[in-house]
Amino acid sequence: MPVIPYVVESNGREERTYDIYSRLLKDRIIFLGQQVDDQISNALVAQMLFLQADDPKKDIHMYINSPGGSITAGMAIYDTMQFVSCDVATYCIGQAASMGAVLLTAGAKGKRFALPNARIMIHQPLAGMQGTAREVEIHVAELRRIKQRMNEIMIEHTGHSLEKIEEDTDRDRFMSADEACSYGLIDKVVKSVDD
């Protein structure tokens, strides 16, 4: 069971205790700090929709430290990032791999960041499957459609050609923060909150 820190705020007459994620939400900060699955996806989607309703003109700040995970859960987060009218600024701390990298690069243009020692990894979608030959064929066709859509997203957010994206995602491709910036996955490497 993960340990969740709490913070206490007082305004003179009363004290309030928040779990750290609820407190960060007050400052429009959301956090993807685990593998992408339906549970974290639903939580992030709900937080973005709440922040959109609260103030549709203020940025949302999404911090990412994720090894990737479920494509469908990740696409729910991606679609919501594109759906809300607020800009979603993305920050890679630690790692953004696979679906985590897709979400990192899906941030608002000019507002995609990584800390200096962050690692970013892109690759083609992965899947394991079993069943009859026909069932496997159906899954392979779906995996090809997913790969095509992932490539379209990377093209849209990086400006690279389909050929380059296909070549670069054929196998795991790891990048430093500086390399990810040169590649177009992020806009800037930041060393402090003042950058």
From Swiss-Prot:
Q: Which Gene3D superfamilies match?
A: 2-enoyl-CoA Hydratase, Chain A, domain 1 (3.90.226.10)
So where's the catalytic machinery, residue-wise?
98 (nucleophile), 123
The enzyme class is: hydrolase
Q: Which GO terms describe its cellular component?
A: cytoplasm; endopeptidase Clp complex
BP GO terms, sorted:
protein quality control for misfolded or incompletely synthesized proteins
Its EC number is 3.4.21.92
What InterPro entries does its record include?
A: ClpP (IPR001907), ClpP/crotonase-like_dom_sf (IPR029045), ClpP/TepA (IPR023562), ClpP_His_AS (IPR033135), ClpP_Ser_AS (IPR018215)
Which PANTHER family does the UniProt record give? ATP-DEPENDENT CLP PROTEASE PROTEOLYTIC SUBUNIT
Q: How does it assemble?
A: Fourteen ClpP subunits assemble into 2 heptameric rings which stack back to back to give a disk-like structure with a central cavity, resembling the structure of eukaryotic proteasomes.
Q: What does this protein do?
A: Cleaves peptides in various proteins in a process that requires ATP hydrolysis. Has a chymotrypsin-like activity. Plays a major role in the degradation of misfolded proteins.
Q: What is this protein called?
A: ATP-dependent Clp protease proteolytic subunit 2
Annotated source species: Rhodopirellula baltica (strain DSM 10527 / NCIMB 13988 / SH1)
Q: Which gene encodes it?
A: clpP2
